[in-house]
UniProtKB/Swiss-Prot annotation:
Boundaries of every RNase H type-1 domain copy: 971-1093
GO BP term, pick one: proteolysis
Organism annotation: Maedi visna virus (strain 1514) (MVV)
Record-annotated active site: 464 (protease)
Protein known as: Gag-Pol polyprotein
Family that this chain belongs to: Belongs to the retroviral Pol polyprotein family.
A GO molecular function held by the record: RNA-directed DNA polymerase activity
Record-annotated Peptidase A2 domain positions: 459-530
DNA-binding region: 1447-1499
Length: 1506
């Protein structure tokens, strides 16, 4: 009993798997399931109740016995609930024991109850059956076939309970599910064939699945007919399927085999359809996407259906049915609208015609046009219909005269079963390969057939290294059957029977392997799955130079080949090399070298991770002495240059190098030596017969050889897209699937003639296809490894960093992001094991690239569309994207910045690289989109800054990268950063102060605007995901809130800020006016305005407040000989304040040891590297270790006094006014003035005022200028008119054949001019918008020309708020100012035209001369006057608005509600909605007065005016 108890504690081992399956059954509708404790409780309770059964094993018989006994028990009222739980748990255990998988406890009880109903009341049932069938044998009781006592059989209908149970399982789990298959196999063992097929037909399920099941049954029937010729004792298909038989006839014993075969066929069909439904290419899973056209959907659907191994009627049914049911909702509605009730029976061509426009932008307009189009005449139906079989219009596929297509040879006119080529293959001679299993291209020179015992029979099998599986035509049924298996090869898809654990014997070696029984195979094949186990190998090396053209190679002139002795190798490596070389010799790849071949190249070997040895050859010396060949292939093909194809195939050439013979006269130079251990025998010398690995010409010889072999074949197939790189072949086409595979077949057969093998395990049919590191998909491409490894902060070796960067650079054509900080990290020590330190900035830069790689996908090239290349400003690099449609890039890339080149030059360099890439990959010249404006690029070209522009180019606005709008002008949760930047104390400074207490400041050169942006950039770098930024720069504030998508980004600081902000969650930007008493804003302004002590480097330590100086650190171990001085440069740059100087002193610990610092004074404002001069006063050498504190830096205040001369009253040096008192300082400016005049030809007054030279000297310069004397203006110009600020005149003028529109501001004389195409109103209105945008005028005067008086022009002037007047007709004085400007402009233009290449540039130079270089009598130019007037207007407007805000009033105060006397007048300090604030003069206090006690009065000035 003790032992039994211990066994019970351990549970029930024989029911371990049963209990495990039972624990998956749910208790109710929720997710709660039975537990192991529930099962053990039920089993132990049963053992306790029925002690007589306790020792019996838990079989299904024992469980049924317990179930019957439990039914006979009546529990007490208090135990009914536990008793019901016991019964339910037992029912679940019984179902698991029988292999059933009910989902819930209730379902398990129903199953047991149903099975119990089939067996309960046996006596009552027996009596009932005995009445119906008196001759029934009572001991054999099965339904619906019943055995009669007379020896015959009868039939009874399938019970409704069983039928309902099967219906329930089919609805819950599916018609082809394992549950339904298991239930049907259980019940149908005694059914007739007719019962099985009728019940299967009445089951609920997908109609397409039922058609596929019927097709599989038809295939089984055809296979039965082929394998079992008609005979006296052979069952026919009609007998197996129960056709033409009554129920009584089908129930007889002679039909038992037919019923079993029928059930087996049904089970096989269910399994085949189930496996088919889970495959990725299942047609029923091909559904139309929302963004996909109906034609593309049909192409994918037909491709999937054509690939299915089913009969043509089923394919036709699937095409008609799935083309409607799997279409999108829009297409279904369109088909319903167009085809009406016959939509389910319509052909695919009719549905494509109906849905041709669904999804396009003009869909609604086309529907409207169709509705308004008159009805066509009858009799024209089908004229535009297109046959999907031959591709010709005028008929449908089912009416095609070309007939059906053979799935074996790809030809039209016959079916596969009637194919002559297939029959001829069955009569091939020994050595031929199986065309159905392997492609017909593997035609080697008589591959051997060997005798293999398969099961109990000896067979001659063809040794085929290209076949994956072992194929036999018949089998003795030994082993374990594993059902049907689908074999896919280049020749098509076929189906066979798989058997495992089959006894195989070759000579004395016996194994248990796997075979495939394929009755239609013309030859039996031993595949790779069993060759290795049996120790069989086959090398088919083709070394016949008659077939493969040989490429001539030779040594350089005067070279005699390598003569390098073989170095010693260990015993282990010699054994590994011997094994490899022996194998190569057997395969015919190396041969024994004759004695007079004296050259030698060393060999060695390494052990791979798998434990096998790999042979390596040191060809460095031979490579040096060998003449080079031209490069056959200049680069790697790129998927962005591929065209989108319907079908693709990727092939790999096996043993590519070892198939091509080496040029025979050259072979003597490739000799190598196999050493003999301990010199126990002579060495063995070999030479290479084929292209060896590691030889520098192997790739070139291989590529030239393949070029010669494939040239003719490629020319014969212009309809395909063919690519080859080394041993990888790409084939793409838009042909039908059979035709495409036929071309692949043809290529394989063609190169097989030269001995090249195409292993099937490396062949890829269809998408996705892996090729050259890329992964090709139907509509896109990406990299095979579409992720980059993560990096973390901390040390990293240069070797590992280089590998990471290499992975990134390889994927740049999908990333397109620069990594300047990571690249900078690679600078310095070039030792591979040297360490670098990864910081947070590097991690962020790397993560940005990883995220971009996840998001990006490349597209294919369309030869009918133009190609565009768009360049953009990146982080210290130029980034560009190549595309044909927006948002669908072909590829992207990065060109890193080049020193000493401007931004424009760098962009042009990147554009050159982009153009070159596009031409190489597509053969087209791209249209280049440059950032900025066209005028800027034309000016850069004219000025000579750039010397090349693309053939086709234009400009664009906006940066396509920044789309995220997460900057708002509201407060967000998070810290606040107060930023400021600008020129402080003559130096650029920037920084921020955060609400968290964090501070940052730094010196940096730049303009005020740049420094303000840099301060924001630094705050964004350090700030969290949510933060606030406060700035007093209106420029920076408006930039942060600007719509960046429409901004021309030319500022690299702005681009970097955009990238930082793009990665934030949300940023609140706020503006405050500067110097207005806001505490935090004043604090940051003071903080960066201080001249602060700044350091760079790690050579100094922070000091305590009580320390005298800062400790300096020795950068490395320094050795100072006795009595000598050494200068030590430390890792420190320092920036002293202007009122400081510093001294480097000796530390007392060093002075005690006789080591002193010499000198060491640092002047105020010094910004360089610190050097320490050390003197060793000892008589022995002193060593200062690295990191030791060896000196100190002491800061001192700077005191400056002027030196007064003693007795000397005159100075000899130059003063502020020149040499002594001569005043001749202006003489040095005369050459500068002459040079300036030669550029701009300004007048004498301008030269006099700008360069400070005498008026007479300036006039001499003008008079000596030949250009100015030839183009002299008239001395008097008459005429005048109204003048005023912001009042302009406009008119057209002509210069040679060019028309110029001239504007002049009448107050300042500022001129604005543009070359126009004509004197039209449209042209004038366009120029008016440009003029208004730059100058904001108020009024304009013109003549009565048609362009000026047009109605549209008047409406535009009214819209812009410009007061427009016209002059007096035929009175030139009304336009005198602009007429005089015409003459001045043309006179100056004539002087400058020879200096410029383009007329527009000369016109711009003229405006510079007249507006900026021309000075008036007061020394001001027209531009100065115009700007001064604008500023005065602003100041007046501001003062006026301030004046309007100042108010005065009388007021009275109240005491206990009673008003006092009126006081005042006084100024209102603040005014609100219901009260004001004033200052009481008597008490000097601020009072709040309600509006009812206030009387406002006019300002004092207005009182005086009155």
């Amino acid at each position: 009993m003790a032992k039994q108890g211990s066994k019970e504690k351990k549970g029930y081992p024989e029911l371990k798997e049963v209990i495990k399956a039972t624990c998956k059954i749910r208790v109710g509708p929720g997710k709660e399931t039975l537990t192991e404790g529930n099962c053990l409780w039920a089993l132990k309770t049963i053992d306790f109740i029925f002690e007589d059964l306790k020792t019996e094993p838990w079989t299904i018989t024992k469980m049924y016995t317990v179930w019957d006994r439990l039914k006979g028990l009546t529990p007490e009222e208090t135990s009914k609930r536990e008793f019901a739980s016991l019964q339910a748990t037992l029912a679940c255990i019984m179902c698991s024991q029988m292999g059933m998988k009910p989902e819930t406890v209730q379902a398990a009880k129903g199953i047991i109850s149903m099975k119990e109903g089939l067996h309960e009341n046996k006596e009552a049932k027996g009596e009932k059956v005995e009445q119906l069938y008196p001759n029934l044998e009572k001991h054999r009781e099965v339904y619906p076939i019943v055995n009669l006592q007379a020896g015959g059989r009868s039939w009874k209908a399938v019970e409704s309970v069983v039928f309902q149970q099967l219906q329930t399982v089919a609805m819950q789990h599916g018609l082809v599910s394992e549950d339904f298959e298991r239930q049907l196999a259980y019940y149908a063992t005694t059914w007739t064939s007719k019962d099985i097929l009728e019940v299967l037909a009445m089951m609920p399920g997908n109609r397409a699945q039922k058609e596929l099941i019927q097709g599989k049954l038809n295939e089984e029937a055809e296979r039965w007919v082929r394998q079992n010729p008609p005979g006296p004792n052979v069952l026919t298909v009609d007998q197996i399927m129960g056709v033409g038989q009554t129920n009584q006839q089908a129930s007889q014993a002679n039909m038992d085999q037919a019923r079993q075969i029928c059930l087996q066929w049904v089970i096989t069909a269910l399994r085949s359809v189930r496996h088919m439904s889970h495959r990725p290419g299942n047609p029923m899973l091909v559904k139309q996407k929302n963004t996909e056209s109906y034609e593309d959907f049909i192409a994918r659907l037909l491709e999937a259906i054509d690939a299915e191994p089913v009969t043509d009627p089923i394919k036709t049914y699937l095409k008609v049915t799935l083309s409607y049911t799997n279409a999108s909702t829009d297409c279904q509605k369109q088909m319903d609208r167009t085809l009406g009730t016959r939509v389910q029976q319509a052909t695919v061509e009719e549905k494509m015609q109906a849905c041709r426009d669904v999804g396009s932008e003009g869909f609604k307009m086309q529907l409207l046009a169709q509705a308004l189009r008159p009805q066509g005449k009858a009799g024209h139906k089908g004229v535009n219909q297109k046959c999907y079989n031959c591709g010709k219009p005028g008929h449908l596929a089912r009416q095609c005269r070309q007939g059906i297509i053979c799935h074996h040879c790809g030809k039209r006119g016959h079916m596969q079963k009637d194919c002559r080529q297939k029959k001829q293959q069955g009569k091939q001679q020994e050595g031929a390969t199986c065309g159905a299993v392997r492609a017909p291209y593997v035609v080697t020179e008589a591959p051997p057939k060997i005798e293999i015992k398969v099961g109990t029979r000896w067979k001659k099998l063809l040794v085929d290294t290209g076949a994956d599986k072992t194929i036999v035509t018949s089998h003795d049924m030994s082993g374990i059957p594993k059902g049907r298996i689908i074999l896919q090869g280049i020749g098509g898809i076929i189906e066979g029977e798989k058997w495992e654990q089959v006894h195989l014997q070759y000579k004395d070696k016996m194994i248990k392997g796997t075979i495939v029984v394929l009755a239609t195979s013309p030859v039996e094949v031993l595949g790779r799955d069993n060759m290795r186990e049996l120790g069989i190998g086959l090398i088919m090396a083709n070394l016949e130079e008659k077939k493969i053209p040989s490429t001539r190679v030779r040594l350089k002139e005067g070279c005699k080949g390598p003569h390098i002795a073989q170095w010693p190798l260990t015993q282990e490596k010699l054994e590994g090399l011997k094994e490899i070389v022996d194998r190569l010799e057997k395969e015919g790849k190396v041969g024994r070298a004759p004695p007079h071949w004296t050259c030698n190249t060393p060999i060695f070997c390494i052990k791979k991770k798998s434990g096998k040895w790999r042979m390596l050859i040191d060809f460095r010396e031979l490579n040096k002495q060998t003449e080079d060949l031209a490069e056959a292939q200049l680069g790697l093909p790129h998927p962005g240059g591929l065209q989108r194809k319907k079908h693709v195939t990727i092939l790999d050439i096996g043993d590519a190098y070892f198939t091509i013979p080496l040029y025979e006269p050259y072979r003597q130079y490739t000799c190598f030596t196999m050493l003999s251990p301990n010199n126990l025998g002579p060495c063995v010398r070999y030479y290479w017969k084929v292209l060896p690995q590691g030889w520098k010409l192997s790739p070139a010889v291989y590529q030239f050889t393949m070029q010669k072999i494939l040239r003719g074949w490629i020319e014969e197939h212009p309809m395909i897209q063919f690519g080859i790189y080394m041993d990888d072949i790409y084939i793409g086409s838009d042909l039908g699937l059979e035709e495409h595979r036929g071309i692949v077949n043809e290529l394989a057969s063609y190169i097989a003639q030269y001995g090249f093998m195409l292993p099937e395990d490396k062949r890829q049919e269809g998408y996705p296809a892996k090729w050259l590191g890329f992964e090709l998909h139907p509509e896109k491409w990406k990299f095979q490894k579409h992720t980059l490894p993560e990096i973390t902060e901390g040390p990293i070796t240069l070797n590992k960093l280089q590998k990471l960067v290499g992975d990134l650079v390889w994927r740049q054509s999908l990333i397109g992001k620069s990594i300047p900080n990571i690249l900078k990290l690679m600078e310095g020590d070039r030792a591979l094991q040297s360490e670098r330190y990864i910081e947070s900035i590097h991690v962020r830069e790397w993560e940005a690239c990883r995220q971009k790689l996840k998001e990006m996908e490349g597209n294919y090239y369309d030869e009918e569309k133009d190609i565009y290349g768009q360049l953009d400003w990146g982080n210290k690099a130029i980034e560009y994207i190549v595309f044909q449609e927006k948002g669908k890039p072909l590829w992207v890339n990065v060109v890193h910045s080049i020193k000493n080149l401007s931004q424009a030059q760098q962009i042009i360099k990147a554009a050159q690289k982009l153009t070159q890439e596009v031409i190489i990959r597509t053969g087209k010249i791209p249209w280049i989109l440059l950032p900025g404006r066209e005028e800027d690029w034309i000016l850069e070209l004219q000025m000579g800054n750039i010397n090349w522009m693309p053939s086709f180019w234009s400009c664009y606005k906006g940066s396509v990268r920044w789309k995220k709008r997460n900057v708002i002008a509201e407060l967000v949760p998070g810290p606040t950063y107060y930023t400021d930047g600008g020129k402080k104390n003559g130096r650029g400074s920037l920084g921020y102060i955060a609400s968290t207490g964090e501070k940052f400041r730094i010196h940096e050169e730049g303009t005020n605007q740049q420094l303000e942006l840099r301060a924001i950039e630094e705050a964004c770098k350090q700030g969290p995901e949510k933060m606030n930024i406060v700035t007093d720069s209106r420029y920076a504030y408006e930039f942060m809130l600007r719509n960046w998508d429409e901004e021309v980004i030319r500022n690299p600081i702005q681009a970097r800020i955009m990238e930082l902000v793009h990665n934030k969650e949300k940023i609140g930007v706020h503006w405050v006016p500067g110097h207005k008493g806001i505490p935090q804003n004043e604090e940051i302004d003071r903080y960066i305005s201080e001249i602060f002590l700044a350091k760079e480097g790690r050579g100094i330590l922070q000091k305590r407040a009580e320390d005298a100086g800062y400790d300096l650190i020795c950068p490395q171990e320094i050795s100072i000989p006795a009595g000598q001085v050494k200068r030590i440069a430390i890792d420190l740059k320092i920036n002293l304040k202007k009122d400081q100087w510093a001294m480097i002193g000796t530390k007392s610990s060093f002075a005690n040891k006789g080591v002193f610092v010499q000198g060491g004074i640092i002047d105020s404002g010094y910004q360089g590297t610190i050097q320490v001069v050390i003197y060793n006063s000892n008589n022995k050498e002193v060593v200062i270790p690295q990191g030791r504190k060896f000196a100190q830096l002491i800061l001192m205040p700077l005191i400056h006094e002027e030196l007064e001369p003693w007795g000397e009253t005159r100075k000899t040096e130059r003063g502020e006014q020149g040499f002594g008192s001569t005043g001749m300082y202006w003489i040095e400016n005369i050459p500068l003035a002459e040079e300036e005049h030669n550029k701009w030809h300004q007048d004498a007054v301008s030269l006099h005022l700008e360069f400070g030279i005498p008026r007479t000297a300036a006039e001499d310069i003008v008079q000596q200028c030949d250009v100015c004397q030839e183009n002299k203006m008239p001395s008097t110009l008459r005429g005048s008119n109204k003048r005023g600020i912001d009042h302009w005149q406009v008119d057209y003028t002509h210069y040679e054949d060019k028309i110029i529109l001239v504007w002049v501001e009448t107050n300042s004389g500022l001129i604005y001019a543009e070359r126009v195409k004509g004197e039209t109103g449209q042209e004038f209105r366009v120029q008016t918008m440009k003029w208004y945008a730059m100058f904001a005028p108020k009024s304009l005067q013109s003549d009565n020309g048609p362009a000026f008086v047009a109605e549209s022009t008047q409406l535009l002037m009214k819209y812009l708020g410009i007061e427009h007047t016209t002059g007096i007709p035929w009175n030139p004085q009304s336009q005198a100012l602009v007429e005089r400007t015409h003459q001045t402009l043309k006179n100056t233009l004539e002087k400058l035209i020879p200096m410029f290449n383009a007329f527009e540039s000369a016109l711009a130079g003229t405006l510079i001369t007249l507006n900026i270089k021309r000075k008036g009598g007061l020394g001001t130019s027209p531009m100065d006057i115009f700007i001064f007037n604008k500023e005065q207007q602003r100041i007046q407007q501001q003062s006026k608005s301030k004046q309007e805000k100042i108010r005065f009033c009388y007021y009275r105060t109240r005491k206990r509600g009673h008003p006092g006397e009126w006081q005042g007048p006084t100024q209102v300090l603040w005014g609100g909605d219901g009260a004001i604030v004033v200052k009481d003069r008597g008490t000097d206090r601020y009072l709040v007065i309600a509006n009812k006690d206030v009387k406002f009065i006019p300002p004092p000035k207005e009182i005086q005016k009155e």
